[in-house]
């Protein structure tokens, strides 16, 4: 649903740049309907169910027992993706939501010999950069500063890239940390030397969050998601080209919620609802962290507005609160359409994607192949000059099965074309075979007649290369064909 909403918004914004007055109002009406469905039903009800199921464990320990945890990424999650690789590159993309990461994985799965593994983990509350980035580093303990301005990993600061590299080198002396742009700006020789000399490299990428966090650009966040998909796939390919045996692991510090329409006033909590706002340690549109002693000021009625989150993973002395569903804390400035920091699935579920390339001939190597079509109709006899042939795309165009465009045409035994040429796309991704049926309409060429004895063939060829993939034998029992073009 999140992915469908994102793609719908992106498509709608594209239509606004095309002059078509007839479609403008109907398109707006459809988008408004979908907006109401997403905001008032999906986000509200799905996260109400999620909160109801999880709030007890959040209050007790701050996380759900069972799913992988972001604060255990380095010691418990990362090793399961590394295998025997000598070099591991961790790409951390700020605000890479899980459903966006699935698009990255789908793109990488189309690589020859590319192997992709997709998993997820739960982010640490509050789901913000200042907490998520330290959680992804090696540590025994995280500690929130008394004023909430930074998080320490085993007593070491983590706010900047050099500081994160210092934390990494504390456990892996050859480790490096740098921005993805800095890595790509290196000369090829420098990149290869870096990966050869380092067993562990953290690359930091930031496209989604830097777009969404600004009021002037927050409505471009879904375009930023599309750019991020392409950039991360290209970055992973580059790493595996620079170091063929490397393992790439992509993850994020947090996700986000975005809605085209701003919230109503009733969906925002102000100071009357928050009697302890005089002393917040951390405060955002979707999260609140206060000293333990401030919690006593909260009434029983107000407690029902929030989800209580144990903050033990960030040290003692703090209590966390997140608004339920898609409610925001009212704060001046910032953005209202793009937010994160809370406990919704969209904010809390972060991806973990493993990618590596297998050498040709190895047991892990899987080559790509084109999606194929075959004739579904049992009959092989044509009795009308205007007719249809039903075909089926044999596999969904997913992973190593790539979309392909074909040309279909009827020929005689000498290879002369006796029908028009029909384009057929094998690009359907549905796992339901009935949704992969292709209907091809043909019109026979004008002629004196067709021989019922002579064989005719339905020929399928790749449109790009002209290579014949298959041909099926048919009988054409039509005494004449029309001389006029009826538009088929």
Regions found by a protein language model. Name each.
Residues 1-488:
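Feature captures the catalytic ectodomains and active-site-proximal regions of enzymes
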């Amino acid at each position: 649903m999140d992915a469908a909403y994102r793609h719908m918004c992106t498509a709608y914004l594209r239509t606004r740049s095309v002059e078509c007055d007839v479609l403008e109002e109907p398109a707006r009406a459809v988008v408004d309907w979908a907006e109401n469905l997403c905001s008032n039903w999906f986000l509200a009800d799905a996260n109400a169910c999620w909160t109801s199921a999880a709030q007890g464990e959040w209050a007790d320990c701050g996380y759900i027992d069972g799913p992988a945890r972001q604060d255990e990424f380095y010691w418990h999650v990362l090793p399961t993706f590394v295998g025997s690789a000598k070099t591991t590159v961790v790409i951390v993309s700020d605000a890479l939501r899980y459903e966006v990461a699935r698009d990255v994985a789908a793109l990488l799965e189309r690589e020859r010999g590319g192997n992709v593994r997709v998993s997820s983990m739960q982010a640490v509350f509050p789901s913000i950069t200042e907490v998520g980035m330290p959680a992804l580093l090696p540590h025994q303990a995280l500690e929130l500063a008394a004023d909430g301005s930074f998080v320490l990993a085993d007593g070491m600061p983590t706010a900047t890239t050099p500081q994160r590299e210092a934390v990494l080198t504390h456990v892996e002396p050859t480790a490096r940390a740098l921005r993805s742009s800095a890595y790509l700006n290196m000369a090829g020789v420098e990149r290869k030397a870096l990966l050869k000399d380092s067993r562990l490299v953290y690359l930091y990428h930031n496209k989604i969050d830097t777009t969404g966090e600004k009021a002037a650009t927050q409505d471009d966040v879904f375009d930023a998601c599309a750019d991020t998909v392409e950039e991360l796939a290209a970055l992973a390919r580059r790493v595996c080209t620079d170091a063929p045996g490397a393992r790439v692991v992509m993850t994020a510090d947090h996700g986000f919620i975005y809605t085209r329409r701003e919230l109503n006033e009733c969906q925002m909590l102000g100071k009357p609802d928050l009697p302890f706002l005089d002393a917040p340690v951390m405060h955002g549109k979707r999260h609140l962290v206060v000293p333990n002693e401030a919690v006593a000021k909260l009434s029983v009625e107000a407690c029902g507005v929030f989800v209580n989150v144990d903050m033990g993973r960030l040290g003692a002395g703090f209590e966390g609160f997140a608004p339920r569903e898609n409610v925001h804390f009212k704060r001046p400035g910032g953005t209202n359409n793009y937010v994160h920091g809370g406990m919704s699935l969209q904010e809390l579920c972060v991806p973990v994607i493993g990618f590596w390339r297998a050498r040709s001939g190895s047991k892990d190597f899987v080559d790509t192949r084109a999606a194929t079509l075959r004739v579904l109709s049992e009959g092989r006899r044509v009795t009308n000059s205007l007719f249809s042939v039903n075909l089926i795309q044999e596999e969904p165009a997913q992973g190593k099965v790539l979309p392909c465009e074909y040309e279909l045409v009827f020929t005689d035994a000498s290879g002369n074309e006796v029908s028009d040429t029909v384009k057929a796309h094998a690009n359907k991704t549905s796992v339901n075979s009935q949704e992969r049926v292709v209907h091809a309409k043909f019109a026979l060429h004008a002629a004196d007649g067709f021989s019922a004895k002579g064989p005719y063939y339905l020929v399928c060829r790749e449109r790009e290369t002209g290579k014949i993939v298959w041909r099926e034998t048919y009988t054409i029992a039509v005494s004449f064909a029309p001389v006029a073009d009826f538009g088929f």
